[in-house]
């Protein structure tokens, strides 16, 4: 059982991309399809992680903040927040808030997007990050 333990320990050290490549090589070498194998209860999260493709391992770097819904009773508070974030004038911000869904900020970092989302949600609006 020592060989198996060694192999398992080495697999634990692999990155997600390396684990994905390992799964592909095992499938090719042994002519099996891992996606058809039913995981044993308790191990499913570990097996699912190793089956992810390299595309799913990519981290999104740029985010868009989209104002989705503005409740009428929260409009003034949301208008103030939108003005402070966008730098729009009063008239432009009013038109912006009344024409949802609208992109508030585009291609920003995840941290900035989360901060803006929190500000707008605190004012009472619905926001989506994409």
From Swiss-Prot:
It is found in: Plastid, Chloroplast. GO terms for cellular component: chloroplast; cytosolic large ribosomal subunit. Keywords: Chloroplast, Plastid, Ribonucleoprotein, Ribosomal protein. Gene3D superfamilies: 3.30.1390.10, Single helix bin (1.20.5.710). Belongs to the bacterial ribosomal protein bL12 family. Homodimer. Part of the ribosomal stalk of the 50S ribosomal subunit. Forms a multimeric L10(L12)X complex, where L10 forms an elongated spine to which 2 to 4 L12 dimers bind in a sequential fashion. Binds GTP-bound translation factors. HAMAP family: Ribosomal_bL12. PANTHER family: 39S RIBOSOMAL PROTEIN L12, LARGE RIBOSOMAL SUBUNIT PROTEIN BL12M. This is Large ribosomal subunit protein bL12c. The gene is rpl12.
